[in-house]
Amino acid sequence: MASPREENVYMANVADEAERYEEMVEFMEKVVAALNGEELTVEERNLLSVAYKNVIGARRASWRIISSIEQKEESRGNEDHVASIKKYRSQIENELTSICNGILKLLDSKLIGSAATGDSKVFYLKMKGDYYRYLAEFKTGTERKEAAENTLSAYKSAQDIANGELAPTHPIRLGLALNFSVFYYEILNSPDRACNLAKQAFDEAIAELDTLGEESYKDSTLIMQLLRDNLTLWTSDMQDDGTDEIKEPSKADNE
């Protein structure tokens, strides 16, 4: 007979197939809650990541669309519409805050402390940085500053471990470099630092491409392509600065 942990993992897979991501989160939260100092398996940690990625991703997309509509209504001077949209945006921001706080609590209370291998430490610290970055996307004032500082701290801790313990071609190290560079570009408005970080990660991986095992070749080369796409986009944005055109969003890992 399957253990409760195995049953919850099985049901998380079923929920994933059915695209019922809120319930997938609930099943994986039960798995994490039952941990007693031991680690999640690679399959389990990936399921947790996929569940939260989809739950947060839907709301981040909604927030971007609503913010865009709000800007259009403001420019047209439709104050009544703007007031209604602000209220609606606030509702989505409350949902985003709740989701981010949920996974950040799990990471701090259960997952980061029990991570024993380099790749799991980097995986969870990167995840911590990602969810603080999502908070920084919509928070304002001191809350935004605090979220950005926490993002930077988590990504830097992850980077220190990744540079010491993971190969430049490792998909988790590459994914971290991708998301860290997006943070510099989108949140800190530091295009030079974003480009330098992305280019260094890409160049270091290219130099060791022949050492890549078959199992991670596809994952690594996909992230390398995203790094290159962002570099192309960012250098073109920097040259076009001052134009009013809508900028294409940067590409991040697992989003």
From Swiss-Prot:
PROSITE patterns associated with the record: 1433_1, 1433_2
GO BP annotations listed: protein localization; signal transduction
GO CC, one annotated term: cytoplasm
SUPFAM superfamilies per the UniProt record, alphabetical: 14-3-3 protein
Signal peptide location: none
Domain of life: Eukaryota
Family label: Belongs to the 14-3-3 family.
Quaternary organization: Homodimer.
Name of the featured protein: 14-3-3 protein 5
Name of the coding gene: TFT5
